[in-house]
A protein has these predicted regions:
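Extracellular/surface-associated beta-sandwich interaction domains
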Residues: 1-275
Length: 275
């Protein structure tokens, strides 16, 4: 016996069909990318978010199986959601053809959407719709791993979620893209909200009197060893982890090498994400 719920009878019956198909498929279905690990830094009228690249290496075995390995890694991009309540009701604004809230809308600041995707030829509206709506894959912006929100009010509580998403399937398999889950849990007795790795709760505020923010001398990083023709510029994203009067050394390692074995037809092969 099971209980099916929905916004109305039609929505509940649709959810029943999805549950039945999932059962008949032995719970084998496409997997959303893992959520990134997000850190928030609050400031005076400002919130900075930054996150790691762990989501970009997520393997989707189901997609890999049905595409003969072509879409084993179908990561596509990141989106930032912002709300003033932990249920993210502020962001649940995209409804399907029946008026049911279905997708969250990426946060928009000064007319610019907080969404970034790979430059891989996959952009715009995904061809497969979900009850009359389509998923926007992005506009070939390239990836970023930090974001600054300057449209905040000191003393106001905000919740941010950084989700990774994939590009799904196509019209041959009718698999739509999916976001990584926003993991949070509310204790019904105490009201305490437990946040997952990609959700943060912040209250921006001015710094305490006498606070001196982390800084560094010079405009560029001095090249001390190795072969390189590039220039490296610094930006301190999280001043709280920079220790006073310390000297830091930054090292880089190639993430790719020439593919002389003809692997998968590519001219480079990724070895590591970063060090």
């Amino acid at each position: 016996m099971s209980v099916m719920m929905g916004n109305d009878q039609e929505d509940a019956l649709r959810n029943k069909l999805v549950a039945q198909l999932t059962y008949e498929s032995d719970y084998q279905f496409a997997k959303a990318p893992d959520p990134p690990n997000v850190t928030a830094v609050v400031g005076d009228g400002q919130v900075t978010l930054y996150w790691d690249r762990s989501a970009e290496n997520t393997a989707d075995k189901y997609m890999g199986n049905i595409t003969n390995g072509a879409d084993l890694n179908d990561f596509e991009g990141y989106k930032v959601y912002r709300a003033t309540d932990f249920e993210f009701n502020d962001a649940y604004t995209i409804t399907d053809g029946d008026g049911n809230a279905t997708f969250l809308e990426a946060y928009v600041q000064n007319g610019v959407k907080a969404q970034w995707d790979l430059i891989d030829g996959k952009s715009g509206w995904h061809p497969v719709d979900l009850n009359g709506i389509k998923f926007n894959l992005g506009d070939e912006s390239g990836l970023v791993h930090s974001y600054v929100d300057n449209n905040v009010v000191n003393g106001q509580r905000y919740y941010y979620a950084v989700v990774s998403y994939d590009y799904g399937g196509d019209l041959t398999n009718n698999i739509i893209p999916s976001d990584s889950p926003m993991k949070l849990r509310v204790n019904s007795l105490t009201g305490v909200v437990t946040l997952g790795p990609n959700v943060v709760e912040v209250v921006p505020s001015p710094p305490s009197a006498g606070y001196v923010e982390a800084s560094y001398s010079g405009d560029m990083v001095d090249h001390v060893s190795g072969s390189s023709s590039g220039e490296v510029f610094l930006e301190i994203i999280d001043p709280m982890i920079v220790k006073d009067a310390h000297t830091y050394q930054i090292t880089f390692e190639d993430t790719s090498f020439l593919n002389q074995q003809g692997l998968a037809g590519y001219d480079t092969v990724t070895t590591k994400s970063y060090t």
